[in-house]
């Protein structure tokens, strides 16, 4: 009677293990697909990060909203200093230090201090303009649009007058004339006194960031105490999809901007304009613009950045998996989560056709010979953050000593096995 009861228990355990195996396979396929989809959300983060790069070098000086059409007609309060401060780096100059635009090994940001003015002028970020084209991803049909072009707008202030124009078409045409790739970042100066006219000065994004003297010459040579706008343009091609928060795919008619105060989507700002006589009017419906508040979103009362996900596998046999932490804006902390993607204990030649055939050349037999099949009893993932690196460890419980005649069940614990894969999710949160 005891043997019969034990046999039934084994059969039930084997069936349960088979069901668990199918569930793990299904879960692995699901999470891998989700990871592929969510990885595309990093494109949104990359585009926003490129915009914030220049903002880090900008001062927080207030712009004259009386002469600037964007601030005049589109709620200047959305560009308050407090809303922009989190774009600054944490390791700022201390009080009394003199800001410099030269190389400084003590600063990650070698161009300007957190609260210091740009040495020879002010550069302020307004927003990023996104133009989309219809696109259906072959593997993820729910994604129905891709970025066609991004133009980020900044203002260099030399005097009272200010003007922001649409430089998207000009940037592409000029890039082609000069033999530049349409995918390169271009920075263009816009003449404030002549609508539709653009300065011929064009500098690459890389040169603007990496060459302080070239950047200063670019700003000073063309401006000569005039106030000009900067348009930083990036043309995106290929399988690129935009997602707002790393989990909701953008459909073609989905609004881009997120109102953190209201906790809902809202109409975006625009830099498209019409000039009638001496009056400049902005069309708020033509093009999406992410304002300073659009760089993060509100969820459950917390401010978060878009989620970045990667597909990871333990490779070093028994060692923890290390993953570099993403950079977070000032005031936001790193967050991490991991979900098991796939794991198999069956090995090859597993046979579950009957209660008596429960053998496999699996993980319990080092020499590859037949033996008792390892039954999975549990998986756990743990992670810690040390020096901007996530250390992920895994523990797998295996009932390795089940024998129908001995009545002995000696379990074992497997740590960080090579066969275990998981999806890692990272984001920043206050």
UniProtKB/Swiss-Prot annotation:
This is Toxin coregulated pilus biosynthesis protein B. Residues 351-371 are annotated as: Disordered. The lineage of its organism: Bacteria, Pseudomonadati, Pseudomonadota, Gammaproteobacteria, Vibrionales. It comes from Vibrio cholerae serotype O1 (strain ATCC 39315 / El Tor Inaba N16961). Residues 351-366 have a biased composition (Polar residues). Involved in TCP pilus biogenesis.
